[in-house]
C-alpha cells in the first residue's frame, strides 16, 4: 500500500508541476506563482487593450525588472515566442528607452482571464502589455500573448540577411520595417524568421507572383473576405493598426523582394 500511495503522490505532484504555467526568460524559468508573488508585482489597467479590444486590468511585473543585461551590440531585439507559433521581434530600445512601459501580465489560475474575442482561450498565462503605448508608437503585433519564452536575439536583418530590401526605393526600405513588425511574427520570407503560423511569403514562389497586388491588399485588410478555410488564423489589419502609407510601403518591399 505504501508503494501505491507513493506512486499516487508522485503522479499528483507531477501533474501539479505540469499544470503550473512556466515562462522562460533568457534561459531562466519563472512560474506564474513566483511572478505573482514578487514584491514588484502591481495592478495594471489598460484602457484599450489590443487583444481584448476593451479596458482590462491585470496583475503583472515591470518587464524591464525581469530582463538581464543585453549580451552585446547585435543583441538588440527581444524575441517573444508564443505557444501557437507566433514570434514577435520587439526592438529592445522600445522596451528600455522610456515612454511606453511594458509589463509582463500574469494570469492567476484562481482568477482566470476571459476568453479572447472569437476565441476559446484567454491571452494567458503570460502576456506583454503596455502602459501609455502611444508614447512610443507601440504596434499591435508587439503585444504578444500566450507567451512561452522571451529571449535576447540579434536584430532580424542582421540575423537573416535575406530580409534586406532589394530595392533602392525609400518606400521599400520602410516596408522592410513594416514586414518585420507585422508579418514576420507569423510568416517567414525566403527562410528568414521563425514564425510558423502562416506560409513563407518568398518561397518556393514570391507572394506577388501568384497573388495580385489588389488581392494582397485585400488579404491584409480582410483575409476572410478573400478566402476562408477551417484552420485560418489571420485577422485583418485595419487602417488604425496599419495605416495606408505602411501598407503601401509593405507592398513596395514585397515587390522588390519578388524580383
Please annotate each region the language model reported:
Residues 196-202, 222-251, 257:
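Axial heme c-ligation environment in periplasmic c-type cytochrome domains
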Residues 19-156, 259:
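Structured, non-membrane catalytic/scaffold regions adjacent to prosthetic-group chemistry
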Residues 154-178:
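Electrostatic cytochrome c docking/interface patches
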Residues 1-8:
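Bacterial N-terminal signal peptides that target proteins for export
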Residues 62, 179-185, 190, 197, ...:
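Short pre-active-site segment immediately N-terminal to redox-active cysteine/selenocysteine motifs
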Residues 11-16:
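N-terminal signal peptide c-region/cleavage motif recognized by signal peptidases
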Residues 190-221:
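Gly/Gly-Pro-rich "capping" loops immediately C-terminal to redox-active cysteine motifs
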Residues 175-190, 216, 234, 250-254:
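The canonical Cys-X-X-Cys-His
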